[in-house]
Amino acid sequence: MEEFQGYLELDRSRQHDFLYPLIFREYIYGLAHGHGLNRSGFLLLDNVDYDNKYSFLIVKRLIARMYQQNHFHICENDSALNQFIGHNKNLYSQMISEGFADIVEISLFIQLVSYLDGKATSKSLNLRSIHSIFPFLEDECSHLNYASDILIPHPTHLEILVEVLRYSVKDASFLHFLRFLLYEYWSWKSLSIKKKASSIVSKKNERFFVFLYNSHVCEYESILLFLRNQSSHLRSTSFGILLERIFFYKKIGGLVAIFGTPFEHIHILRFLKDPLIHYVRYQGKSILISKDRPLLMNKWKYYLVKLWQCHFYVWSQPGRIHINQLSQHSLHLLGYLLSVGTNPLVVRSQVFDNSFLIDNAMNKLETRIPLFSLIGSLTKAQFCNPLGQPISKSTWADSSDSDIIDRFVRMCRNLSHYYSGSSKKQSLYRLKYILRLSCVKTLARKHKSTVRAFLKKLGSELLEEFIKEEEQVLSLLFPRALSASRRLSTGRIWYFDILCINDLANHE
């Protein structure tokens, strides 16, 4: 019940733009702690004591310190604090950052839900899946020619992150507290590097800084969308929030250096008009795909560099943006190699006694598996050598036979699940062969037997385990016709339930 009460209070605080008082609510830190535990150790991977030390007694002491109106008393490393929370001196700061991230995330989510309710566009929930981008690219990229592979620069000044949140968070006290946290983390990071200790910024508060980085990227993308939609949308009411931005036209005036005409003349943006241009962002990279000639892509390239330098004060070199022709180069996207290949098609046309052969080449998006990089990952995980030859997993030899088989089966299932959309299955078959033979060698090593002798004893039963797992996945997709599902297994299958890229050995 307290959780629902917290969400209702967040909604009321958002309506009045007062988020700072929520930092003094105990249930906020309970929500943040629960979210951290539900993320499978994503946040607290190197801080096991955080779960053991967490209690509402610590939360009460934290809130009491914040009521002193002196933020520097919160994180001071006096002896009493160290005795109370052990060797982890930054527990208070970690709790504050997680509570802060929870407040802002939930507040922005409520804004998004209310916006979608008004627009009635919240239908495609499968867009949360990583695989949802590939069917879109199959439909759109087959007739596009050029792609820009863009490495998004990180903000170099902490004040930029605060300025970005000013457009969505109106509470000045909340933003001042955020500024304090950021500068404290910056000093702690420098101190931890000097002492050769683990950085608090890199892992312990990863969710907090990932949220700030995503806010920075969304600001960059909103300006990109703002200019992409041409002069007909510049005065649209849907972009009213963008027009209210402080110094927007002043900062974006750096475009004059490229175009040589004042920015007030909106018609200068018409040269960027391209109805067949698509934008995709993943992790710290983004891709612009277009049908036009390289001239337009080069204009976008130098525009983006100027945008980063003038609006975000980030120095970025043009070398961070690579323009390639899709028919000649491959793009690395979410574990796949993407390229556009030509599929030759000969059509025979006959009119009375005359017949003609017409060559009609069609473009097709090729999705290939980066075999060598995955073999490198398997080598690092000690499943094979650098040449791709399977070896035994010695660290698993002490486990039971069923546990060893189950681990390898899950790894094969993860590979089949994620790379089911590959246009060429040979690479996937080779990876699964490496894992299967590594499983056999691991079991043979455990029983002090040879691979040949072990296969004669348990070969058919072991093979059934792998085949049963794959048929089980396909039968969920095509329950009425398993034979048809086996034929379709050679084609592309995209799953809409994949929310993240798991490591090969994530189920250890």
UniProtKB/Swiss-Prot annotation:
One of its GO terms (cellular component) is chloroplast. One of its GO terms (molecular function) is RNA binding. The gene is matK. Belongs to the intron maturase 2 family. MatK subfamily. Usually encoded in the trnK tRNA gene intron. Probably assists in splicing its own and other chloroplast group II introns. It comes from Pelargonium hortorum (Common geranium). Its main location: plastid. It holds the Pfam family Intron_maturas2. Keywords: Chloroplast, mRNA processing, Plastid, RNA-binding, tRNA processing. This is Maturase K. The keyword RNA-binding applies. InterPro entries: Domain_X, Maturase_MatK, Maturase_MatK_N. GO terms for biological process: mRNA processing; RNA splicing; tRNA processing. It is found in: Plastid, Chloroplast.
